[in-house]
Amino acid sequence: MKPSERRKARRLAVQAIYSWQLSGNNIADVEHEFLTEQSLDGVDVAYFRELFAGVATKKTQLDELFIPHLDRPIDEVSPVEKAIVRLAAYELTFRKDVPFKVAINEAIELAKAFGADESHKFVNGLLDKLVARK
């Protein structure tokens, strides 16, 4: 498997997590929508499924990891940033085969692609604190 396949899976997973957070729709429905309506060329579909389902089912546990390091209430964190941080927290916690530097770098790149101008700095700082705590 090429690293770019995982990168594309992360990108799709962040979009699905974002959609799920905002819509409140059933996890299976959101996953089905993304798997049938998005281009899956070069996407590690199994990894996408794991990331999306993992974040959705372990949201509370993941939030508890980074909430102590927030500089504001979680309700004030943008939905895009929450989706990215939850995905990275999942990889850092449950995917020991993914080096922490890779998980953080991928999250920063996602924040640059989808977040506001300074999102990548927020995501980087928060994940650095999360890793330092481990």
Swiss-Prot record:
GO molecular function, one term: RNA binding
Domain of life: Bacteria
Keywords for the protein's UniProt record, in alphabetical order: RNA-binding, Transcription, Transcription antitermination, Transcription regulation
GO biological process, one term: transcription antitermination
A Pfam family recorded for this sequence: NusB
GO cellular component: cytosol
Family to which this protein belongs: Belongs to the NusB family.
Record function comment: Involved in transcription antitermination. Required for transcription of ribosomal RNA (rRNA) genes. Binds specifically to the boxA antiterminator sequence of the ribosomal RNA (rrn) operons.
Protein name: Transcription antitermination protein NusB
Upper lineage: Bacteria, Pseudomonadati, Pseudomonadota, Gammaproteobacteria, Alteromonadales
